[in-house]
Design a protein with these regions (language model features):
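Pyridoxal 5′-phosphate
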Residues: 1-286
Length: 286
């Protein structure tokens, strides 16, 4: 059922069941997080320059509304991410560090444990979009010290398109104001309107209407298969295949843009073919 599905999502990311809210998409989950936080003038949000737009626009909007600013940390020339450079950007004004665990273009992986430690020192929140790693790489938000995790089911999880989730550390939920409101935000479908009622204090605080049954149940079924196989085993096989792919690409004169597998344990492989990229694209589409 729906509650069992919520528990499965919680197992995937190392959260408590009662701290996982179902969302229509990962982008909606990020927006709820960014726009629900009580930011103030002067607050800073630290992020990477490689972020997918859905993990950038909500934070820019949140900063603009509050009178804060987004601090963008640049990648290295070879597109690697220097965690030391990111940590150096975290300071007394930092309210949130918002980043992807695994970057969508390069597969670059951020050392979340180190970033979390830096966040704790200044009282900042660590918000992680984990969509590019969940299902193929082990993840435990509690062990890593992550405050909030967003994700979706359509990538490595091999689940339905159009379903996401928001997982929070215990105690963080009530700090966030719902950005979408409905009957379930405040009570049940059977309750009459009470203008003085406060939002709920459980996961339904961010689930305003009918339950997202198809996405939640389909996503949970896919996750259960992955958990039964074992994420560690899946990761090892994915890295083996990625190494074989990269070996073949290099043999054909391609230039790899992804970090070496030993530095960034994501199988995501990005490359430029030998010669004219446009010509290669035209040949493939012919």
């Amino acid at each position: 059922g729906y509650d069992a599905a919520r528990a499965t999502f919680a197992r995937l990311v190392g959260a408590k069941t009662e701290d996982v809210s179902m969302m229509p998409t990962c982008a909606v989950a990020i927006s709820q997080l960014a726009l629900g936080l009580p930011l103030e003038a002067g607050d800073e949000i630290v992020t990477w320059d490689q972020e997918y737009p859905s993990n950038a626009y909500p934070w820019y909007v949140a900063a603009r509304k509050a009178g804060g600013r987004v601090v963008v940390v640049p990648s290295e020339a070879d597109l690697r991410l220097d965690t030391d450079r990111l940590i150096a950007a975290i300071g007394a004004r930092t309210r949130v560090v918002a980043l992807s665990w695994v970057q969508y273009q390069t597969g670059a992986v951020t050392d979340l444990a180190r970033v979390s430690e830096a966040c704790r020192k200044v009282g900042a929140l660590l918000a992680v979009d984990a969509i590019q790693g969940l299902g193929v790489m082990p993840f435990d938000m509690t062990a890593l010290g992550v405050d909030a995790v967003t994700g979706g089911t359509q990538k490595w999880l091999a689940g339905p398109m159009g379903h996401g989730f928001l997982a929070l550390r215990p105690g963080l939920r009530d700090l966030l104001e719902p950005i979408v409101h409905g009957a379930m935000t405040y009570g049940t479908f059977d309750d009459l309107t009470d203008p003085g009622r406060s939002p709920r204090h459980d996961p339904l605080r961010f689930e305003p209407g009918s339950p997202l049954l198809f996405g939640a149940l389909g996503g949970a079924a896919a996750i259960e298969v992955l958990l039964d196989v074992g994420i560690d085993a899946i990761h090892a096989e994915a890295l083996r295949l990625a190494a074989k792919l990269r070996e073949g690409l290099l043999a054909h004169g391609a230039r790899l843009l992804s970090a070496p597998l030993g530095d960034a344990p994501s199988p995501i492989t990005t490359f430029l073919p030998r010669g004219d990229v446009g010509a290669a694209a035209r040949r493939l589409s012919a």
